[in-house]
C-alpha cells in the first residue's frame, strides 16, 4: 500500500460538479493499493498516519499528530500511484490492484483510520475527481507498507 500524504489547511473533492468530501484542515491522502496488499497493510498504514507527528507545536517543531491537533482526513483512491514509468512513454499499471479488490481494501483502510479516532471524508472510488487543497508547509510524505 502506498499513500501520498499532504498536510492541508483545507481540502475538498468534487465529482460531476458536486463536492462529495471536504475537510477544514488535516491530512489529504492519495491512496494506492497493489494486488499484494492485505488488511494488515491497511491497518499498519492507518495507525502510522494517525500517529505521525507532522504538525508543529508551539516552538515550530513537528511534534503533533493529526489526532493531537484534532484534524480530519480526506482520503482519495488513486490507482495511478502504482504506475510504472520506467519503460516507454505510457505508464504501466499492472502493479495496481484490480478494482473490486482495491475498493474493498480501500474501504477497510478508511474504517481503520476511523478506528484511530479520526473523521474521514472520501472521494468516490473509481470516479474522475477534482481534488482541491491548500498544502500546508508544504508537507508532503510518501508512506508505504512494504
UniProtKB/Swiss-Prot annotation:
It catalyses: glycyl-tRNA(Ala) + H2O = tRNA(Ala) + glycine + H(+); a D-aminoacyl-tRNA + H2O = a tRNA + a D-alpha-amino acid + H(+). Coiled coil: none annotated. GO terms for molecular function: D-tyrosyl-tRNA(Tyr) deacylase activity; Gly-tRNA(Ala) deacylase activity; Ser(Gly)-tRNA(Ala) hydrolase activity; tRNA binding. GO terms for cellular component: cytoplasm. It is found in: Cytoplasm. Transmembrane segments: none annotated. Homodimer. This is D-aminoacyl-tRNA deacylase. It comes from Bacillus cereus (strain ATCC 14579 / DSM 31 / CCUG 7414 / JCM 2152 / NBRC 15305 / NCIMB 9373 / NCTC 2599 / NRRL B-3711).
